[in-house]
């Protein structure tokens, strides 16, 4: 019996790695940031060359989130809606699948004291809207998985989280 009937796992190149400006705690960025459409084109090239079959992203890697317009992805004429369609067309053309969609609560200063576990109900609502947007974007791209990344969501900073108020 031949078990090697094609790819058994996806080789993936995520948006955040391709778009990294190469900064770390020891120094600032050494590269300029790429636009998400340019990153998609690099990922598509890697797919066409046979290096990868899939990609993943944090929502903010594709289109920045604006708490004043938390459902901008639903408006096809919005900058976010247009950019998402452009990125999808580039990836689809190269046959690159989206493996996982990840919400970047950890990357937004608004959620520094937690997102879904923030003691402030207004902040929790915004975090939920951001997660819902990421789920919609993932569905749009046909993502197989959604990752809830709890980094900096308050659980690892018990000193700033008022646990008795978390679920009020």
Predicted features along the sequence, with ranges:
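Active-site cradle of extracellular carbohydrate-active enzymes
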Residues: 168
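N-terminal pre-domain/capping segments
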Residues: 1-140
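Active-site-proximal loop/short-helix segments
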Residues: 103-114, 143-165
């Amino acid at each position: 019996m031949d078990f090697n009937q094609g790819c058994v796992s996806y080789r993936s190149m995520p948006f955040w790695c391709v778009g990294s400006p190469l900064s770390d705690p020891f120094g600032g960025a050494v590269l300029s940031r790429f636009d998400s459409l340019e990153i998609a084109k690099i990922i598509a090239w890697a797919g066409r060359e046979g290096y990868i079959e899939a990609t993943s992203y944090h929502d903010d890697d594709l289109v920045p989130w604006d708490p004043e317009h938390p459902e901008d992805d639903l408006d096809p004429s919005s900058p976010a809606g247009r950019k998402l369609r452009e990125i999808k067309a580039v990836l689809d053309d190269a046959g690159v699948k989206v493996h996982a969609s990840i919400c970047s609560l950890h990357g937004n200063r608004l959620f520094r004291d937690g997102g879904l576990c923030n003691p402030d109900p207004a902040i929790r609502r915004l975090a939920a809207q951001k997660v819902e947007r990421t789920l919609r974007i993932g569905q749009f791209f046909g993502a197989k998985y959604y990752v809830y990344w709890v980094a900096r969501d308050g659980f690892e900073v018990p000193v700033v989280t008022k646990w008795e108020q978390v679920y009020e």
